[in-house]
Amino acid sequence: MPMQEPQRRLLDPFNSTRTGTPHLKLSANQTGPWCLHVSIPDGLFLSLGLVSLVENVLVVISIAKNRNLHSPMYYFICCLALSDLLVSVSIVLETTLILVLEAGALATRVTVVQQLDNVIDVLICGSMVSSLCFLGAIAVDRYISIFYALRYHSIVTLPRARWAIVAIWVASISSSTLFVAYYNHTAVLLCLVTFFLATLALMAVLYVHMLARAHQHAQAIAQLHKRQHLVHQGFRLKGAATLTILLGIFFLCWGPFFLYLTLIVLCPKHPTCSCFFKNLNLFLALIIFNSIVDPLIYAFRSQELRMTLKEVLLCSW
């Protein structure tokens, strides 16, 4: 079903916040004086992208440098870093292109600008999809390592991991290309929102199950050492905090953007929804922030990777 306004392109509001042709065409009467619009300065946007770029490049270099990290788990982490890198770079690239065009420093044809916009949109959408896929892949990998520890190396082999990585990248690029081609259909947005909810549900179920298994192990150890109450209390607090941080950051950083897509389908012209649409830049900034946080959660907690990172930094100096 063809989509109504406001949806010419998924990231058009991102462009229109800086151009003179507003995509949403919101008037004061539509949004009301109570509407809260959080403005994200271009400098902050570019700074977040630069931090994400440097951080994720260091993760990729560290994993590539250390042969001890050439395992399925670290391959998934490396691909997550690469996806996060592309998310940040593509969004920042579009921001930079808009600023350059606004300043009149780049004179080019409309068709060329449209082609550049298509390429950047494919990068943005593809990197977002691949980032979500690799977050799910890391959760599955950790689940297998805990519940099938003795068979882990026979289940998660390097060839299978490589095929999974190739499949994720191919699916991400293909889906993003289809999205750009059929951006004006509600089915596209519904597929993206469904994919996000499925990834969130998968991660929640797997990590909660892993937390329950770890709790059982802690209970058994506590009974052996006769320190059951203290160990249980400490483990519950630490495990709950870790799970809350892991899923909480994922939901807070990605949730607003996919809520934005959902509201475009459900209430494209409602005043409350129209007010929400005006904050797309904030939602994109949260996604870039997630690209900064991901290495701290998934990569830098590894002592081996931290040691390699120190070597990389020392060599660069």
Swiss-Prot record:
<keyword id="KW-1133">Transmembrane helix</keyword>
<comment type="subunit">
    <text>Interacts with MGRN1, but does not undergo MGRN1-mediated ubiquitination; this interaction competes with GNAS-binding and thus inhibits agonist-induced cAMP production. Interacts with OPN3; the interaction results in a decrease in MC1R-mediated cAMP signaling and ultimately a decrease in melanin production in melanocytes.</text>
</comment>
<feature type="topological domain" description="Cytoplasmic">
    <location>
        <begin position="64"/>
        <end position="72"/>
    </location>
</feature>
<feature type="transmembrane region" description="Helical; Name=5">
    <location>
        <begin position="192"/>
        <end position="211"/>
    </location>
</feature>
<dbReference type="InterPro" id="IPR000276">
    <property type="entry name" value="GPCR_Rhodpsn"/>
</dbReference>
<comment type="function">
    <text>Receptor for MSH (alpha, beta and gamma) and ACTH. The activity of this receptor is mediated by G proteins which activate adenylate cyclase. Mediates melanogenesis, the production of eumelanin (black/brown) and phaeomelanin (red/yellow), via regulation of cAMP signaling in melanocytes.</text>
</comment>
<feature type="topological domain" description="Extracellular">
    <location>
        <begin position="94"/>
        <end position="118"/>
    </location>
</feature>
<dbReference type="GO" id="GO:0004980">
    <property type="term" value="F:melanocyte-stimulating hormone receptor activity"/>
</dbReference>
<keyword id="KW-0325">Glycoprotein</keyword>
<feature type="topological domain" description="Extracellular">
    <location>
        <begin position="267"/>
        <end position="279"/>
    </location>
</feature>
<protein>
    <recommendedName>
        <fullName>Melanocyte-stimulating hormone receptor</fullName>
    </recommendedName>
</protein>
<feature type="glycosylation site" description="N-linked (GlcNAc...) asparagine">
    <location>
        <position position="15"/>
    </location>
</feature>
<feature type="transmembrane region" description="Helical; Name=7">
    <location>
        <begin position="280"/>
        <end position="300"/>
    </location>
</feature>
<feature type="topological domain" description="Extracellular">
    <location>
        <begin position="184"/>
        <end position="191"/>
    </location>
</feature>
<feature type="topological domain" description="Cytoplasmic">
    <location>
        <begin position="212"/>
        <end position="240"/>
    </location>
</feature>
<dbReference type="GO" id="GO:0005886">
    <property type="term" value="C:plasma membrane"/>
</dbReference>
<keyword id="KW-0675">Receptor</keyword>
<dbReference type="InterPro" id="IPR001671">
    <property type="entry name" value="Melcrt_ACTH_rcpt"/>
</dbReference>
<feature type="glycosylation site" description="N-linked (GlcNAc...) asparagine">
    <location>
        <position position="29"/>
    </location>
</feature>
<keyword id="KW-1003">Cell membrane</keyword>
<feature type="transmembrane region" description="Helical; Name=4">
    <location>
        <begin position="164"/>
        <end position="183"/>
    </location>
</feature>
<keyword id="KW-0812">Transmembrane</keyword>
<feature type="transmembrane region" description="Helical; Name=6">
    <location>
        <begin position="241"/>
        <end position="266"/>
    </location>
</feature>
<feature type="transmembrane region" description="Helical; Name=2">
    <location>
        <begin position="73"/>
        <end position="93"/>
    </location>
</feature>
<keyword id="KW-0807">Transducer</keyword>
<keyword id="KW-0297">G-protein coupled receptor</keyword>
<feature type="transmembrane region" description="Helical; Name=1">
    <location>
        <begin position="38"/>
        <end position="63"/>
    </location>
</feature>
<dbReference type="InterPro" id="IPR000761">
    <property type="entry name" value="MSH_rcpt"/>
</dbReference>
<feature type="topological domain" description="Cytoplasmic">
    <location>
        <begin position="301"/>
        <end position="317"/>
    </location>
</feature>
<feature type="topological domain" description="Cytoplasmic">
    <location>
        <begin position="141"/>
        <end position="163"/>
    </location>
</feature>
<feature type="topological domain" description="Extracellular">
    <location>
        <begin position="1"/>
        <end position="37"/>
    </location>
</feature>
<dbReference type="InterPro" id="IPR017452">
    <property type="entry name" value="GPCR_Rhodpsn_7TM"/>
</dbReference>
<keyword id="KW-0449">Lipoprotein</keyword>
<keyword id="KW-0472">Membrane</keyword>
<comment type="similarity">
    <text>Belongs to the G-protein coupled receptor 1 family.</text>
</comment>
<feature type="lipid moiety-binding region" description="S-palmitoyl cysteine">
    <location>
        <position position="315"/>
    </location>
</feature>
<dbReference type="Pfam" id="PF00001">
    <property type="entry name" value="7tm_1"/>
</dbReference>
<feature type="transmembrane region" description="Helical; Name=3">
    <location>
        <begin position="119"/>
        <end position="140"/>
    </location>
</feature>
<keyword id="KW-0564">Palmitate</keyword>
